Amino acid sequence: VSVEGELGVLGGQEDHVFAATSTYTNPLDAVEFIQKTGVDALAISYGTQHGANKGKDAKLRREIPIAIKECINRLGIFCALVSHGSSTVPQYIVKEINDLGGDIQNAYGINVDELMAAIPCGIRKINVDTDIRLAVTRNMKELFANQPELRTSPSIGGVYALLEEKKSAFDPRVFFPPIMDTVLTGNVPDDDVALLMSRVEAGVKEAVGSLIVNFGSYGKAPLVEQKSLEDMIAFYKK
């Protein structure tokens, strides 16, 4: 099992836990944490923020991952640095949600150029869950707008009702209770649920696919070394 740690505090809200301010990660503390715990990855606080309200023109303190990377490289330690709270919050998706009856205000993310500049500084994993949530929510609203007969569907009509009731929400988990069995088990009871889930999948692909290209990861999957379970066991026994 790969283990990811986190050091520092990101402002914003994640899974109903809110922090009003950020505490930047001290590079020396990060190196000590990595040495003592042996984590495979470490999420750091260097200017990102959870949620869709990160403020305009957020700037990342790239000197923090640079310092950590330089120290662990000199010590011969491998640890991937992780960027939490890094959603870009595409403005076209926010606009489309609001045009479809949503009410998302003051939603701004991290500029893609800032994230691209952080990658050479040691960032190896970038979390963009808010982007995925926005794209999925937009797609569900769009589906019910284009096919109004689905609003009274016995299986997914409840999803539409929640979309209408909670106009400022964009976390799909808020809207999924009527189809929670499908979400948890993969069981698809009818064509309406299958159609809705296809829109969910398309939203995930849209959000992630564009960033894979921006971050320079397109076409690199074959370069990842494949390891068997036995190989992994042997590696982590060292």
Predicted features and spans:
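Alpha/beta enzyme core
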Residues: 1-80, 91-96, 100-108, 112, ...
